[in-house]
Amino acid sequence: MKRLRFKATLADLAEPHAGGGCLLPDDRYWPVDSKGDPQLHLMTIPTAWVEEGSEGWLSFFTPYDREDTYLHWETLTSEAGNASVVLLHDNSGTASSGGHDALSPARTIQLELTDEPERCRQFTSRVSQHIAWLKGREQVEGHACRMMVNGDDFDVGLAGAPGVFSDGVVYVFLSTDFHTQCRPGTCGLLTFQFS
């Protein structure tokens, strides 16, 4: 199993991390939501964690409203209107956080390879083709669900903003050929299921 471990240890933006900002190329605009507001950066990891031998980095963004911190829960579905973004890019450029500086500094994410079998109903944060759905299975045309992140792990990675995804699981859908796409570019989206 490729397990994702979220640590409280502070991280550099050039390393795999949750929270904080990220190093987007200077010619790439920060993702915005349907109202034009900057999205919250959730995490950045190497593409090789998902597709062995591939180059580049993946950064994950979600709409987030500081006044109503649960508003984004209802919008992150496989239906139309989902404004979340996964970007494929080189991990270079100017450090930015899209205006969410005060929420949480960057914290370490590690990939742990284990011999532990992947169980269908296990909600461990992981990179996998074997996904445990909290509710019903979701599908996004032209994409495959390649990763799931337990909401409790975001409470570690985004310690300054607890509850961003409490009581649920974030599912990462990437385009089936994402690792061959030109960088930088949009290559996926997030969905969220909660109990």
Regions inferred by a protein language model and the residue ranges of each:
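Preference for intrinsically disordered or flexible, low-complexity segments
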Residues: 1-195
